[in-house]
Design a protein with these regions (language model features):
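Hydrophobic/aromatic beta-strand elements that line small-molecule binding cavities or substrate pockets
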Residues: 19-21, 80-87, 112-121
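Beta-strand/loop substructures that line and gate deep hydrophobic ligand-binding cavities in soluble
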Residues: 97-154, 158
């Protein structure tokens, strides 16, 4: 069970969107779900995130985990992303930066946007989760092809509700 709606604290000028939601679960329980890429499709809820390709949990900053994706505006419809973990501070914060991996060389490149979850215990079994989508480091050439944010602002609120449903 969760309490209160997620509140969209948006700042489009600052090139990031921030939402928060209080979830009736410990930070450890919430973090465990976020560190499991096999749960990310359920957290997303749009059908864009399809499945984990590695089958392993996130355990450290610098780790790369791969996901199968689908988006109608992507040239291939189905594609893969390689996410590099930027922050791993169990059970307080986790963040990753999506990118691509060249199949021929395995070389990774990243687009400059980051998904970050900050968790704060607000009671014995209550956590305030703050989700930040930050695209401030996206270079101009990428911005010519992708509009930011590439989803409606309700997407982040919905993601936190899905996370709450999975944890509780």
């Amino acid at each position: 069970m969760s309490s209160g709606p997620a509140s969209g604290l948006t700042g489009m000028e600052s090139e990031r969107v921030v939402v928060s939601k209080t979830i009736e679960a410990t930070p450890e329980a919430v973090f465990a779900v976020l560190a499991d890429p096999s749960a990310h499709a359920d957290i997303d809820g749009t059908g864009w995130v399809r499945e984990s390709l590695d089958g392993s949990r996130i355990i450290a900053a610098g780790q790369v985990f791969r996901m199968a994706m689908r988006h109608p505006n992507h040239p291939d419809n189905d594609y893969k992303v390689a996410n590099r973990v930027e922050v791993f501070d169990e059970p307080r914060a986790i963040a990753w930066q999506p990118g691509t991996e060249l199949p021929e060389t395995g070389e990774l490149s990243f687009g400059g946007w980051i998904w970050r979850y900050d968790l704060e215990a607000t009671g014995p079994s209550r956590t305030t989760v703050t989700l930040t989508y930050d695209w401030s480091a996206v270079p101009a050439p990428v911005r010519e092809h992708i509009q930011f944010p590439p989803f409606g602002l309700d997407h982040l609120d919905n993601s936190l509700q899905h996370l709450s449903d999975l944890v509780t």
